[in-house]
UniProtKB/Swiss-Prot annotation:
Keywords: ANK repeat, Repeat. It comes from Rickettsia felis (strain ATCC VR-1525 / URRWXCal2). This is Putative ankyrin repeat protein RF_1087. InterPro entries: Ankyrin_rpt (IPR002110), Ankyrin_rpt-contain_sf (IPR036770). ANK repeats lie at residues 17-46, 50-79, 83-112. The keyword Repeat applies. PANTHER family: ANKYRIN REPEAT AND PROTEIN KINASE DOMAIN-CONTAINING PROTEIN (PTHR24198), ANKYRIN REPEAT-CONTAINING PROTEIN-RELATED (PTHR24198:SF165). It comes from the Bacteria.
Length: 124
């Protein structure tokens, strides 16, 4: 991957074959590649066709170290996808408690829907 990026950094950093490289690396759990892409200027807020950002993917995977890396790189913590879901909501729906705790530590906004989810979690 590093060779591909060095060859044509401007267009490859964010896309390859219409796929978002950060999204692919996050889904595969390659934290080192995520860090490398961010260092090379990849956009931490890049969205796919459903409006899902890098944090949405990391939240679904429960990858806490990647979530923290993305937030520190400027990822918008309260971004909405086209279904109006935030990364925090996806972490809750996926049962990724460590990710939920991290989002709350970074002061992710808790909306009405999320309040209902959190009340259910607290009762269990």
């Amino acid at each position: 991957m590093k060779r591909i990026i060095k060859k044509d950094q401007s267009s490859v950093i964010n896309y390859i074959n219409d796929q978002k490289l950060l999204h692919l690396a996050i889904r595969a759990g390659y934290k080192n590649i995520v860090e490398y892409l961010l260092k090379k200027g990849a956009n931490p807020n890049i969205q796919n066709n459903n409006g899902e950002t890098t944090l949405h993917f990391a939240a679904m995977n429960g990858c806490v170290r990647t979530i923290e890396c993305l937030i520190k790189s400027g990822a918008i913590i309260d971004s909405f996808d086209k279904f109006e879901r935030t990364p925090l909501e996806l972490a809750i729906n996926s049962g990724n408690t460590d990710a939920v705790k991290l989002f709350l530590q970074y002061e992710a906004t808790i909306g009405n829907t999320l309040n209902q989810y959190l009340n259910i979690l607290v009762k269990n």
